[in-house]
Amino acid sequence: MLTKNELADIGVLDFQIFLNSLSVTDILIGNGFSINLCERLMYDSLCDLFNKSASNEIKSIFKGFETTNFEKVLEALSNTEKVGSILRRDMKVIRSLKSELKSGLISTIHATHPKAAEIKDTMLRSLAQDFEPFTDIYTTNYDVFLYKIILASNMLSEMNLESFELFNDGFYEEIGNGKLGFVDFNLYPRNLVYLHGALFLFAPMGNTFKLKKLDDGIEFIKLIKQYLDDDEFPVYVAEGKSEEKREAVNNNYYLRTAHNKLKDRDSEVLVVYGFSFSKSDDHITSVINNSKTKQLIISIRQRDSVKEVEKELSRLRVKFPKIEVLFFNSDTLFTFDYPKNYYG
């Protein structure tokens, strides 16, 4: 691995240097952040993992629809079941495939996501401290980590242990049965914005809501299963090509609003951590290129050679031809190895 000095020689600096010299306000968080907290989240595609144990029938349906989107397949199976019922056909096979799809997705989520007991409060409070310089957090992650971190940040403020501005995520309308409806991002000074949705967001009638019971430490996987049993699917965009993701975003009011918030940011500086800007996320790249952003400060993880790092720096610069792209050592922003500031 390269030393800090070797990285600095090719323009990959400690994050503190940028924090001291630039007006840092917002941050975009990708899957690299969650992987640092739980290596099981290394799978970008739940569908790829699901297919390792799926039946040939289910695999052929995904292939036939040319999709990796669970929701599209579930919708197709549900519609087929309805038509069959109207025509009084035996739908036993379809019901079996629906059951396999739902239970397989739940098993896949369970295999990749941490249990509540694995998410240590000390680590959440420590990371809340690391997020202190940032006003808005934008993320393409669909797990529960960042939501838990903003709750920890708010708790520290409310207990007068820190003077952080409060966070919200736009969901603050009580709509009953443990649900909070999305309103806007204007009520609180700091926001967590789910650019690709999250596994605890649902929009059965087009109006997106969040499962409030997450606040009570209930295993959110159990809650997801309850909604899947009613053929309601989480609002999350994690599968497919960039064009498919863009279409999914445009079809949901909350996701459109989230992307517009990223595009319409007032700040000219955006920090990026753990986000690769791969081809499947070109829609995010496009939003940033069409925003007021003038400087991107992107995390770079350790590699074995200067040549490897320089190749990555060049790839990222090409994606943003009109934006100054700067780089920082990913080891110098967040503390994952040991939590600091235990707060007694």
For the regions a language model picked out, list residue spans one by one:
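Surface-exposed cleft-lining segments at the edges of enzyme active sites
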Residues: T108-K115, F167, S242-V249
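A Trp-anchored, charged/polar loop motif used as the substrate-binding/catalytic surface
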Residues: A8-L13, A116-M123, F171-L180, R246-L262
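Extended, H/D-rich, highly charged conserved domains that either
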Residues: T25, F65-K72, L77-R88, A128-S242, ...
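Gly/serine-rich nucleotide phosphate-binding loop at the start of the catalytic core
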Residues: M1-K148, S157
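SIR2/sirtuin-family catalytic core signature
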Residues: M1-I27, F33-L37, K245, Y253-G344
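Short, flexible loop segments at boundaries between secondary-structure elements
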Residues: S55-S60, G170-L187, K294-E312
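Single-residue recognition of alpha-helix boundary sites
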Residues: L41, A152-N154, T285
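Residues at the C-termini of beta-strands that transition into short coil/loop
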Residues: F50, N141, H196-L199, I300, ...
